[in-house]
């Protein structure tokens, strides 16, 4: 009985997410508030003291 209710909840959750408009569905699965700012996050290395980023900003080099 417990499995059936959990399964029903899961099916209802997926159906609601698929039936929602695209923006709401994206926000639901991204776990961010609706209307949140969508920025591209760039993964830049963090350099130690005495180092700096190279021209491509992909590696740390000694200054």
From Swiss-Prot:
Protein's cellular compartments: Secreted
Signal peptide: 1-19
Bridged cysteine pairs (disulfide): 47-60
Presence of keyword Amino-acid biosynthesis: no
Record key words, sorted: Disulfide bond, Secreted, Signal
Tissues showing expression: Expressed by the venom gland.
Gene Ontology CC annotation, any one: extracellular region
Residues making up the propeptide: 20-42
Transmembrane segments: none
Protein name: U-reduvitoxin-Pr9a
Organism: Platymeris rhadamanthus (Red spot assassin bug)
């Amino acid at each position: 009985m417990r499995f059936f209710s959990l399964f029903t909840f899961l099916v209802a959750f997926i159906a609601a997410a698929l039936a929602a408009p695209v923006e709401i569905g994206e926000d639901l699965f991204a776990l961010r508030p609706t209307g949140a700012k969508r920025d591209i996050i760039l993964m830049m290395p963090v350099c130690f003291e005495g180092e700096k980023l190279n021209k491509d900003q992909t590696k740390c080099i000694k200054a």
